[in-house]
Amino acid sequence: GIRAVDHAVETYLSIDANAYTDGACLQALRLLGEGLPRVKADPSDLDARLKCLMGAWMSMTGVITGSRLGASHAIGHILGGSAGVPHGHTSCIMLPYVLKWNESVNGARQKEVAIAMGRAGVPASDVLNDFICGLDMPRTIRETGVEEDDLPRLAENCMLDDWTFSNPREIRSPDQVMEILRMAW
């Protein structure tokens, strides 16, 4: 599902991206962008399920070849491990906000994400937000039952996750993580 979309997006935008991972991840986004809404509409649609299966498999190309991911995954690890938010939900919540926060450093590549998702000319953060909303998945941290008072502790804990430091836009302090968490609140 959206976890695979998150893998594809963060691999494509990774500081370790390369021609091999780029091709696999953009194709994964095309497949998932078509397949996921179709499966939601008709769970018995086997062609749509195959597209999702292939997209999910291709989305892992970067991870299995050593590409480091970014803040969506890093924050997601902490939301899951420290606050009990299901792993798939962390991607639904964090990915669009991380894209928006990172746009100043990888906006051109984010345009390719939007194109792969079939929405050229729309900011990737909006494309993913709309896509996730269309699947009726959670979009804010608030929806998960996490308390706002917990955000500073979660931001501190994010500094313990290696992928915080491989985010395309440099993160070096909990205050920067708090900027993203507040967007997602």
What spans do the regions from the language model cover?
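C-terminal charged capping/lid subdomain of soluble metabolic enzymes
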Residues: 113, 119-185
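ATP-dependent small-molecule kinase catalytic core of the GHMP/sugar-kinase superfamily
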Residues: 1-2
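Active-site segments that bind and position negatively charged phosphate/pyrophosphate groups
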Residues: 11-127
